[in-house]
Amino acid sequence: NDRSSNKNRGSVLSIYMIVLYGSMALGMFFLNFNSPLNFEPFILVSLFMSISLIPILLTKRKAPTFKKITGMSLKELYDISPLGMVGSLLYGTTQSALFSLLAVYAASMNFSIFEISIVTFLLAISGAVAQWPIGMLSDSFDRRLVIIYSTFGAALFGLFAILAGGQMYLPGELATTKNWFYISVVLFSFCSLPMFAIIFAHTNDFIPKEKFVAAGAGLQFAFGLGAMGGPFLCSIFMDLVGNNGYFIFLIFFHCAIGFFAIHRMKVRKTKDNPDSQFTPLPQTITPLGIELSPITEHIDEPYSEKVQKMLKRKGVAFRKKETEIPENTENLKDK
């Protein structure tokens, strides 16, 4: 956040999510190296966590410095970005259920351990690949539109996954291979997993820089609240409806995010990008016009003597600092 602007924040956050989901995808295959009932996989996880600290400890780049860090209540965060708060809460519910119960769902569909690792790998790697293009789209268009299309796209491909899962167990030649189910999961993940980064970027579009930390904490808190209840609610729904209740649960919450985003687009119009400094100016412009242009900044440092002489020869007047003796500019006015 410290090194990004509203023009590229979606792309920057996408890189972070690519690393996250890419590493998760690789971790899925460790299920095949040893039984989860043994202690060795947990030692391996502890080892990787320790190794992950090394780049942080060795980096020379300083942590972001904010001139002033101010707090923000959850109510204030909701007032600034209702879609950010509600979207984080609902998405936390879906993502926790998605990753926690996917293996349970696949096992109930008689998938082997290797096939389960394939499904979870495809889910994570597809989400990693999707981060960059969808993040760039969110930087080019209204982020709420990207959220709407992504959520309803995920709901559609979730429905395809239900149909593909049912087709696998039809009798005779009517049955299909598991490849169609894999494709449905990949497309579902492609639409769903970039969601939180876009919600995060959308919220920061309306928040001053000194409140980024507080806003991020609030969004993570809302995400965590949803994540606590997601697996529990989804498992109850699967008991009531059956195995297909897994994707029905995900479809319902994705549609809820999409409909709420549509509602917010009707309530709040698109916010102009505060980082954009475009101002219509003529091709030839006077010095006064340059001062009026918002892309030029006032420089407090005095000009060097060489530059001052050059400007005076060209008849250009310049202001001196208030602490200096004001210069008589009558002759310059005559010029």
Task: Set out the residue ranges of the language-model regions.
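Cytoplasmic helix-loop-helix junction between adjacent transmembrane helices
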Residues: 1-18
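A membrane-interface helix-boundary motif in multi-pass transporters
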Residues: 33-47, 236-254
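C-terminal membrane-cytosol helix-exit motif in multi-pass small-molecule transporters
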Residues: 32, 46-65, 259-265
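Intrinsic disorder in cytosolic terminal tails and internal cytosolic loops
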Residues: 66-70, 264-335
